[in-house]
């Protein structure tokens, strides 16, 4: 257990920038992207100096389904495309136990994936034991990913993080899937992690922009001792997007934090390559702000918009109802039920 809290005032703060454009960003394009575009983005990220590049369906390996959204290509086609052009960064993927299996993990490893984030709901870390331990056996860098972290109090979340550490995770994330956490919420959770985790266990932050706080939350996290930061080109991701990598890197420069990223190269990739792929602007607007306000899983946005159009509803009505019911990832099908209930009351 750590006895001191690291601070970002130290001259030796070195960040590990994990890009999620090609995983969380899949939600923004309904999991449709060509392997050719994956290669272009992955190559640009590798050249720009990010430490790791995550590639998979938005809901992780084997996420292709009617519930989560069928992809235009398989995980394997996307991973192979990225692996062919990534020479410096660690090729990473996401796995949700119950969706992806150990078999998929092993196949990803064989294709060149070096790092995996094993994701569970914030109170269900115990289901990650087999996948984390197997990843360690495969010689992979392994992180635990506690989704919807705002739904667990700091101490409870830290206890779940400790479980993931005990299974072999090198790092555990505060994962703000709903973009609901404010700076104080992030600060409290990172401190709770640091108080209970071993000093050598790293801590990560995965922020969403739904309340326009993703950069601020990531900065606060680093100030409290986080070293791994998730970000994406142009914030490309579910809901209002992830922490946009360009402004975060700019702020890191202003703080004097060490990293390997080329800011201008990231800006060019964001504006020239990623933004043109978006069929819906990834931004804070009335729908995505409601995600954060109601604490709703960011990937529910497109599902709610589809249901709203089908049943003549305001997307915000659906999202508020989803938040009231406390739906979590994997319950996308219930969005239609909620829409039907709301439509019947009109």
UniProtKB/Swiss-Prot annotation:
Substrate binds at residues 23-24, 177, 206, 297. InterPro entries: 2-IPM_HCS-like, 4OH_2_O-val_aldolase, Aldolase_TIM, DmpG_comm, DRE_TIM_HOA, PYR_CT. Mn(2+) binds at residues 24, 206, 208. One of its GO terms (molecular function) is manganese ion binding. Pfam families: DmpG_comm, HMGL-like. It is an enzyme of class 4 (lyase). One of its GO terms (biological process) is L-leucine biosynthetic process. Its EC number is 4.1.3.39. It catalyses: (S)-4-hydroxy-2-oxopentanoate = acetaldehyde + pyruvate. The record marks 23 as: Transition state stabilizer. Residues 15-267 form the Pyruvate carboxyltransferase domain. It comes from the Bacteria. The active site is at residue 27. The keyword Ribonucleoprotein does not apply. Keywords: Aromatic hydrocarbons catabolism, Lyase, Manganese, Metal-binding. HAMAP family: HOA (MF_01656). Belongs to the 4-hydroxy-2-oxovalerate aldolase family. PANTHER family: 2-ISOPROPYLMALATE SYNTHASE 1, CHLOROPLASTIC-RELATED, HOMOCITRATE SYNTHASE-RELATED. This is 4-hydroxy-2-oxovalerate aldolase 1.
């Amino acid at each position: 257990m750590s006895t001191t809290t690291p601070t970002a005032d130290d001259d030796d703060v070195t960040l590990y920038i994990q890009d999620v454009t090609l995983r969380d960003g899949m939600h923004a394009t309904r999991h449709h992207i060509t392997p050719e575009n994956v290669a272009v983005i992955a190559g640009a990220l590798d050249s720009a100096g990010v430490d790791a590049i995550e590639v998979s369906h938005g809901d992780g390996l084997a996420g292709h389904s009617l519930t989560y959204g069928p992809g235009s290509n398989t995980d394997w086609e996307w991973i192979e495309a990225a692996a062919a052009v990534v020479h410096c960064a660690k090729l990473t993927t996401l796995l949700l136990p119950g969706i992806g299996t150990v078999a998929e993990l092993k196949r990803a490893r064989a294709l060149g994936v070096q790092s995996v984030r094993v994701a569970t709901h914030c109170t269900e870390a115990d289901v990650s034991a087999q996948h984390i331990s197997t990843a360690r056996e495969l010689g992979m860098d392994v992180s635990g990913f506690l989704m919807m972290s705002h739904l667990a109090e700091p101490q409870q979340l830290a206890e779940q993080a400790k479980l993931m550490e005990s299974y072999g995770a090198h790092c555990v994330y505060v994962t703000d899937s709903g973009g609901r956490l404010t700076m104080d919420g992030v600060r409290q959770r990172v401190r709770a992690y640091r108080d209970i985790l071993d000093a050598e266990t790293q801590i990560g932050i995965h922020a969403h922009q739904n309340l326009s706080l993703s950069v601020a939350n990531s900065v606060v996290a680093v100030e409290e001792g986080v070293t791994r930061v998730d970000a994406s080109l142009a914030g490309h991701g579910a809901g209002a997007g992830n922490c946009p990598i360009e402004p975060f890197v700019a702020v890191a420069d202003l703080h004097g934090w060490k990293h390997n990223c080329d800011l201008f190269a990231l800006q060019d990739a964001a504006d020239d390559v990623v933004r043109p792929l978006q069929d819906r602007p990834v931004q804070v607007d009335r729908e995505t702000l409601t995600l954060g306000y109601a604490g709703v899983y960011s990937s529910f946005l497109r599902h709610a918009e589809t249901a709203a159009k089908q049943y003549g509803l305001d997307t915000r009505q659906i999202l508020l109802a989803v938040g009231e019911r406390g739906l979590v990832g994997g319950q996308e099908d219930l969005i239609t039920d909620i829409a039907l209930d709301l439509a019947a009351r009109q």
